Swiss-Prot record:
Pfam families: Ribosomal_L25p, Ribosomal_TL5_C. The lineage of its organism: Bacteria, Pseudomonadati, Thermodesulfobacteriota, Desulfovibrionia, Desulfovibrionales. This is Large ribosomal subunit protein bL25. GO terms for cellular component: cytosolic large ribosomal subunit. It comes from Nitratidesulfovibrio vulgaris (strain DSM 19637 / Miyazaki F) (Desulfovibrio vulgaris). GO terms for biological process: translation. The keyword Ribonucleoprotein applies. It comes from the Bacteria. Keywords: Ribonucleoprotein, Ribosomal protein, RNA-binding, rRNA-binding. This is one of the proteins that binds to the 5S RNA in the ribosome where it forms part of the central protuberance. The keyword Ribonucleoprotein applies. Belongs to the bacterial ribosomal protein bL25 family. CTC subfamily. Part of the 50S ribosomal subunit; part of the 5S rRNA/L5/L18/L25 subcomplex. Contacts the 5S rRNA. Binds to the 5S rRNA independently of L5 and L18.
């Protein structure tokens, strides 16, 4: 297992809109860390490190969050949970982090990536994508950052469903039925 990336944050005292506005004026991002035991800690962090970390790990990869509470530091495995963006400036305005237990499965929405050109599309069929992400359950360190689906052998009238996905060991889809992910259909007017 490779070393987890770490984000250093500070516990914040000021709460509410006014305090958060003052933080943003100093190019800090307010947030909340919800630990695995259910406690929440209001935090603040520098903008650049959190942006770089988000680019590197996204919403599906676990990392360590180091909380500095007036000199007392504690480190916890975490995931990005909810992110609010500034409506104009396209930067973070508030971030919630979710603490995780590395031994317990978590549920996360994982993006799907489609590769290759389907055989059915090459002969005139139309590719229809029904889902672009899927809820996945796995231990945090086994969670895939994306699920890659090869479309090369997909012919007209064929479908790739949830049960057809290459999920790997310890990873399962959270779905109550075997719904379609992607299909190649006949062009309009043909059967």
């Amino acid at each position: 297992m490779s070393e987890l990336k770490t984000l250093s944050v500070r516990k914040r005292d000021g709460l509410g809109k006014g305090a958060n506005r003052k933080l943003r004026a100093k190019t800090l991002v307010p947030g909340v860390f919800y630990n695995a035991e259910g406690l929440n800690v209001p935090i603040e962090m520098d903008t650049l490190p959190v942006e770089k970390l988000f680019e590197a790990v996204g919403r599906t990869t676990v990392f360590n969050i180091e909380v500095d509470d007036n000199g007392t530091k504690s480190t916890h495995p975490a995931l990005f949970w909810q992110i609010q963006y500034h409506p104009v400036k396209n930067r973070f305005s508030h971030i919630d982090f979710r603490g995780v237990d590395l031994e317990k499965p978590v549920k996360i929405r994982v993006p799907l990536e489609f590769t290759g050109t389907a055989k059915g599309v090459k002969v005139g069929g139309k590719l229809e994508v029904y889902r672009e992400a899927l809820d996945i359950s796995a231990k945090p360190l086994q969670m895939p950052s994306k699920i890659t689906i090869d479309l090369t052998d997909l012919e007209i009238g064929k479908t790739i469903s949830v049960n057809d996905l290459p999920l790997g060991e310890g990873v399962c889809a959270v779905a109550d039925r075997n719904f379609a992910i992607v299909a190649v259909v006949s062009p309009k007017g043909e059967e």
